[in-house]
């Protein structure tokens, strides 16, 4: 069976988007530490209509990113790796290990400290960077390994979304939350009545986002719950869910995530930056992402296979699973996003961002080198195009 063109496009976009994301991060760091650094940071902190520009990026544009994540998850549930329960078990169990172990490592260092709210930071995986790094290895990578990493990262992001909704939502306003639930219920009814026109769902999503913004539950959650009421149908190219997913890939990869990186990596690296890396928070983040992620993913997979709960695909080797588990430690955008919700102190946020970037680069290099050693021979075109 041929791999769908959309899946190929997805991998290609993630690879190119990862490069753009890296460039945006480097540019942001360079400008922030230049002579115009304070003006640059001031731009993102400028108030427009009662909120900062950074706030609009994090609560507005990132909702579109989460909508795409939700649509990806919907596709996996209805027609992808998560559509078959036994096939879905391996990435689900892997993702659980990749969330629980890093969070426990951070908690070990920070329980009882002002940093304990940051335990959700090392739980996340940046799907754009992780898949982008894997794609650098070209046709040496078995398709099942790419699919495993994609499913793992999507489930990981879902776990991060639940973490945000449960632990980082403040001062719940029941009336606004009920309003958002009411809008969602109307959209669900439209879905069940086979209303296959996109604009009612997008319009309802905007209203729902407004209610969520004022409810105390983080507004970006709107993107995910909206995705699951947009009709998927049979998953054919005419499905409005598939069409929207296709339309969103390039804007998210090449506009929204780079803008997020520009807004949230404008960090002034002063003489005390190395001291911030010695804090228990930074140590917890670094060890959580670089050690906890691969340990948790690999350990949980090994236990599940040993118990006979699930099995790894025939064309995968354990050494390759370990390499992908290392790439799971690339937290970057998702980890930074949770950092902004976990802390209010600017110094702590800046220190966390530096730790996240250092951890993500380390995890990427380890994963890339590990896979380069374990993936020896390029696969033929026929093998890379067939499942």
From Swiss-Prot:
Main localization (coarse): membrane
Name this polypeptide is given: Na(+)/H(+) antiporter NhaA
Cysteines joined through disulfide linkages: none
Gene Ontology terms describing biological process: regulation of pH
Membrane topology: Multi-pass membrane protein
GO molecular function: sodium:proton antiporter activity
InterPro entries per record: Na/H_antiporter_dom_sf, NhaA
Origin: domain of life: Bacteria
Protein function: Na(+)/H(+) antiporter that extrudes sodium in exchange for external protons.
Compartment(s) where it occurs, according to its Swiss-Prot or TrEMBL record: Cell inner membrane
The entry's keywords: Antiport, Cell inner membrane, Cell membrane, Ion transport, Membrane, Sodium, Sodium transport, Transmembrane, Transmembrane helix, Transport
Signal sequence bounds: none
PANTHER family in the cross-refs: NA(+)_H(+) ANTIPORTER NHAA, SODIUM ION/PROTON ANTIPORTER NHAA-RELATED
